Each structure stands twice: as structure tokens, then as C-alpha cells.
């Protein structure tokens, strides 16, 4: 993170108007870099710290897609989904904003020093905590309301049922913002099943959701056609899929890896896999 920072009080003209909608807005903000400009469109992308490789890859792709249609990305700077989303926005040449749950001069986690420095150059680091404030578990759920308020929509990519990302989603819903979620994890499945979130499986569906329209059915990639067809007969272990398809086990394992990364399948407890899309 850059060495300089400044503060803005809640009654200042430059204080983000979106944060004034909060029941308990911050008394002041500390900033390194800049605050989002008036009218700047942001998508919050949040999720698990202990995210899967596939989840992080998808978060990065979704962030790049959002930047491609003129949105910046805001998140909490944590390990896993947050970091992947910030990096995806940076890779696409877009703005990204990190909202800290600690002091403005504290890099947490410390391995994100380069990521935060890049975020300052492309957007900003924001905190309601002044210099020297150490990270504390109780500060991160409070921080999440700022993430939700700054964004026009919140996207949860991967989360457990008891996850800070779900707090962000609930805050977004309370503020009348759109909530989106990638199916395939306990927390996101719960958001979708309860009607809190609109399901989003890939970049195409994200852009349709942001535009407020229904996405056209996605075509199954040719390389995954037989595997997806086999999965539609029911969740199964790789060896059982190989028997269904008349394929070798290495071929099935390679296909499952591709299907997970592209959002067509997910791994279940017990080593089984199931299809994720109805199309």
C-alpha cells in the first residue's frame, strides 16, 4: 500500500452518498488512493477465504467481465475470493477498491502488500479505522456493510453457511441492492434457494443479471457434451461415469476438472459429482 492516506468525515461533500444510506454510517473514512467517484458503478464480489481453485478462477473471470462493461470491483481484500476478484479487475485494467477491517496503514493479510499497492494505483483502499488499528474478528462483519453499500450489486462466489460473505449479501439486500450468487457451495445454494440471490454461473449470466435480463441458455461445450449428458442421469463417482460413457477413467477425470472450472459440475461429499446447470 502507498505510504500516504487521508481522512474524510461523514459531513464532507466528498463522503460517498451511498454510505449515508446505512443505518449506522461510518463517522469518517480513511483512504489511500481515492474514493469511488459519484456515479461510479461498482460490483461487490465476495466469498470464502478458503476458496477452491475453481472458485477463485471464476471470481477472477467474473471480475474481468464486470470491468469489460464499465464496472469496478469492491471487496474486502481477504484471501481467496476477495483477492481473486481484486486481481481480476486489475488484470482487466479496471478500478478496484479494498475495504479493510483494520487500520488504513495495516496490510492484512501481509501477503497482499503488492495487491493493495496495485489497488491504490487503480482505485483505493478504504477503512473506517485509523492508523494503527489492529485486525480484530469483530471488525470484519462491520466492514462488510461498507462493501455492500458502495456497490450496485453484490455477487457471492463461494461461501459456507456461516460466512462473512453472507453478511455482505444480507446487508446488500437490506439496502435494496441486487444480490447474485454462484451455485455450488452451501452458502450460495442457501442464498439462491431462499430467493435472496439470483443464480449466476458464468460471465454471460453475470452480464445478463447486471443488465436486468434473462440470459439465453448456454450451449454445452463440445468437449464436455458426453460428460454433462452422463451427469444428467444423476450424481456419480468418476468410475461410474466412465462406465456410463464408455470412457477411460483418465478421460473422465480430465473432463471433470474442465467441468468444475467452467461451472458445469461440482464435487459432492463422498467423491461424487453432479451437473450444475439445467440447460
Regions of interest found by a model, annotated:
Residues 2-279:
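Glycine-biased, small-residue-rich flexible motifs in mid-sequence functional cores and linkers
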Amino acid at each position: 500500500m502507498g505510504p500516504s492516506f487521508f481522512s474524510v468525515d461523514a459531513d464532507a461533500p466528498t463522503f460517498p452518498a451511498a454510505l449515508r444510506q446505512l443505518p449506522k454510517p461510518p463517522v469518517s473514512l480513511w483512504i489511500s488512493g481515492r474514493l469511488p467517484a459519484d456515479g461510479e458503478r461498482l460490483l461487490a464480489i465476495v466469498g470464502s477465504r478458503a476458496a477452491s481453485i475453481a472458485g477463485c478462477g471464476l471470481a477472477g473471470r467474473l471480475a474481468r467481465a464486470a470491468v469489460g462493461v464499465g464496472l469496478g470491483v469492491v471487496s474486502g481484500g481477504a484471501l481467496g475470493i476477495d483477492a481473486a476478484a481484486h486481481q481480476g479487475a486489475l488484470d482487466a485494467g479496471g478500478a478496484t477498491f479494498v475495504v479493510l477491517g483494520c487500520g488504513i496503514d495495516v496490510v492484512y493479510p501481509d501477503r497482499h502488500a503488492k495487491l493493495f499497492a496495485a489497488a491504490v494505483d487503480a482505485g483505493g483502499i478504504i477503512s473506517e479505522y485509523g492508523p494503527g488499528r489492529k485486525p480484530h474478528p469483530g471488525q470484519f462483519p462491520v466492514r462488510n456493510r461498507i462493501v455492500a453499500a458502495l456497490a450496485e450489486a453484490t455477487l457471492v462466489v463461494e461461501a459456507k453457511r456461516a460466512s462473512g460473505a453472507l453478511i455482505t449479501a444480507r446487508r446488500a439486500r437490506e439496502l435494496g441492492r441486487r444480490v447474485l450468487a454462484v451455485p455450488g457451495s452451501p452458502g450460495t445454494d442457501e442464498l439462491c434457494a431462499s430467493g435472496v440471490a439470483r443464480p449466476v454461473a458464468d460471465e454471460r449470466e453475470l452480464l445478463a443479471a447486471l443488465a436486468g435480463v434473462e440470459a439465453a441458455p448456454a450451449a454445452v461445450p463440445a468437449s464436455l457434451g458426453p460428460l454433462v449428458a452422463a451427469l444428467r442421469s444423476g450424481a456419480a463417482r468418476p468410475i461410474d461415469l466412465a462406465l456410463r460413457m464408455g470412457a477411460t477413467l483418465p478421460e473422465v477425470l480430465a473432463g471433470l476438472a474442465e467441468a468444475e472450472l467452467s461451472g458445469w459440475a461440482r464435487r459432492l461429499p463422498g467423491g461424487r459429482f453432479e451437473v450444475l446447470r439445467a440447460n
